A protein has these predicted regions:
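A short N-terminal interaction module
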Residues: 2-52, 56-60
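Non-membrane alpha-helical structural segments and their capping/turn regions in soluble enzymes
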Residues: 7, 149, 252-256
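A general structural signal for well-ordered alpha-helical segments in protein cores
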Residues: 10, 29-30, 60, 73, ...
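Conserved AdoMet
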Residues: 34-109
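Short glycine/threonine-rich catalytic loop with a Thr-x-Gly-x-Asp
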Residues: 96, 125, 251
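Conserved SAM/SAH cofactor-binding pocket of Class I
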Residues: 101-198, 202-231, 257
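Mobile active-site "lid"/loop adjacent to the S-adenosyl-L-methionine
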Residues: 223-253
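Conserved Class I SAM-dependent methyltransferase catalytic core
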Residues: 249-273
Length: 273
């Protein structure tokens, strides 16, 4: 690989991905080149014949090989863009989808007249929905809930990186089952800063009643019927977490989560999306 240039490396990556049947072979090859080299597209067009080091070429072709194996691009770069923000993602969370932005936009529209809204994001995953709302509404606070502790680690990381940690709290719970034991954001962040865990624990002030009224519950739960998962593209069925996809027999299992909410959640203004 001596004397490999940016242009030559990109062409090689495009060819490998195209032969592997990757739909966006050209774009993905470019994005991986940008990720590995740190060079912008403008730099590439100006200095495409510039040589790259052997280590850079090897790293690039390694990622190209993994992408050719249908590992999602975002799992390779650990970057996903949603509502204009960059989120960290890995194999433990769904990659944020652009069409989910309409859910965030609808929530923001519904809460226009609500001052200091409190939001519950059920099945939070990477936290992209809740965090995006908090970025748009500086007066808002929210709780993100997920069954997966590994997913919650990702959500906490994103809340810190995007500077909304003081407005967010995260709870490990099977839907509403543990919601009586909400861990407040400040205490939660202190705990995870010391120990890399998101296991459900109560704050030191354990005599507090953590039930509260939410202005909105928002959720993008698993909705794919079990039998249809095998028909999905490899990037999804082989690499996205199964529990984030599987909506059980008819795909509607988790839409029933609203039936149980009244036991522990009080509504003030807006409602359930």
């Amino acid at each position: 690989m001596n004397g490999e240039t940016l242009t030559g490396l990109l062409k090689k990556g495009q060819m490998i991905l195209a032969q592997a049947g990757i739909k966006e072979a050209g774009l993905d090859a470019w994005l991986l080149l940008e990720y590995v080299t740190g060079k912008s597209r403008a730099y590439y067009f100006a200095y495409g014949e510039e040589s790259v080091t052997e280590s850079v070429a090897e790293r690039y072709l390694e990622l190209i090989s993994r992408r050719a194996g249908h590992i999602p691009l975002q799992h390779l770069t650990h970057q996903a863009f949603f509502m204009g923000h960059e989120f960290y993602v890995d194999k433990n969370v769904l990659v944020p989808r652009q069409d989910t932005e309409t859910l965030v936009e609808s929530a923001l529209e519904c809460m226009k007249a609500v001052k200091n809204p409190y939001i519950l994001d059920m099945c939070t995953g990477s936290g992209c929905i809740l965090i995006s709302i908090l970025k748009e509404r500086a007066d808002a606070h929210g709780t993100g809930v997920d069954l997966s502790d590994e997913a919650l680690k990702v959500a906490v990381r994103n809340a810190r990186t995007l500077e909304v940690a003081e407005h967010a709290e995260f709870v490990q719970s099977n839907l509403f089952s543990e919601m009586q034991n909400i861990v407040y954001g400040t205490e939660y962040m202190k705990r995870t800063a010391v120990k890399d865990t998101v296991k459900m624990t109560e704050c030191e002030n354990s005599n507090r009643n953590y039930s509260r009224a939410y202005d909105m519950i928002i959720s993008n739960p698993p909705y794919i019927p079990t039998a249809e998962i095998e028909d999905l593209m490899d990037e999804v069925k082989l690499h996205d977490p199964r529990m984030a996809l599987d909506g059980m027999e008819d795909g509607l299992y988790f839409t029933g989560l609203s039936r149980n909410r009244h036991r522990i959640i009080l509504f003030r203004v807006v409602g359930f999306i």
